[in-house]
Amino acid sequence: MERDFMPPVIATESHLMSVKSDSPLIAKTRVVLSGSVDAANAVAAYYAEHDCDVTNDDNGAKISLSVGHLILRPGEKHLDIEVGSKSEAGVAQMKAALIAILQSIVPEADLDCRWKGAGESNGKLPNFRELRVIGVTDLSSHMRRLRLAGDDLEFYDGDGIHMRLLIPPRGVVEPQWPTLAPNGMVIWPEGENAVAPRVYTIRRIDATAGWIEVDFVMHGDNGPGSAFALNAQPGDRIGMTGPLGGELPDADWFLFAGDETALPAIGRYLEE
């Protein structure tokens, strides 16, 4: 299913919490800014508005997310920050989200910071996977399924059924993928190399065999996802990040309703 891109600010990636050891990985940094108390309060309020658990004390705030925790400690003209998660991908996600939030709501902050501890930047997104097309199946006149092969897909074989496909420009043989800046922020390719991020559902996955299947609603060239699926040939490359959650809560029964873009998720829920 093709949707508008949703920035990875507050993603409920509960799958990240279940695939690594119980010992959290910790990373710390210091951001230089005046008004650090106001900045910490603004960040904490942002997370609270997105239904995260926020605990305030005399020293700052602790924020609990499905992917880990975030601690804010304001000082004199600086804000000390700690992020903790059970995976390198979780640490990277929280760094990128926090820097993006600070950039948005505290524009005066000096974000030329460096992290110490887990996940020190090597420029790579730990949850990024490059995939290639190995199969094309038309399910109907308006739905096409692509089988995409890649390495290390066990990370995606969990409760989180959604992910983000990074669709390269048409005709680009060697796509440029996003990287991580030293401050943890995601650097996206720009101009003629810009990729189009879109959220999709992993319809099926066989991590051992090394493939996933994704269903695309076909509407010609109107949209990067549909255009990619329409022109897909074996060997074509596409990127993936995530997973993005989508697991069902505990309940006695469910009522599913949606348009054709929701069919892949509904189908997977019914099968599983």
Where are these regions (language model features)?
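Short, intrinsically disordered low-complexity segments
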Residues: 53-88
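A common structural junction motif
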Residues: 48-53, 99-107, 167-168
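Ferredoxin-reductase
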Residues: 136-227
